[in-house]
Amino acid sequence: MAKPLEELAIYDTPKSGLLYMVTLAAKSSNFRFLEGCVRAYIGHAKTPLLLSSGTEDYFLGTYYFNRGKYYTPVAGLTHLVPNAEFSAYRFHEADPIPFQNGLRLTIRNGEESKGKVYGGPPGPAETEFTSYVWAYEW
């Protein structure tokens, strides 16, 4: 269970490799968590080298997945209960993410800037995240 604005690691390795696929499911009392960005910290970086513009954007969706489920060879939304839960996938076959000396992939439960929470009140609620990450390591 992630608290509001908590950054949660969904994959963490000290090895080198290649990120290939990410699946994520989330369940909450509102969709404000979708304002949170997916971040990739490569090596020993303190700041992310990859930053999505929101959770649904990372999975190639928009506007809180307002168009419903979709399936493409690269990304898709396989389950949706509006304003409550979703599951989605993203393949990085065409845009692989290589990493050396470690990769920490995170999701943040909501987002803020200059003291303001994106999406307005009430902000993100506690959110249950489940993930599966497929990476090749060497």
Give names to the regions the model predicted:
Residues 1-138:
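Beta-strand-centric surfaces of beta-sandwich/beta-rich domains
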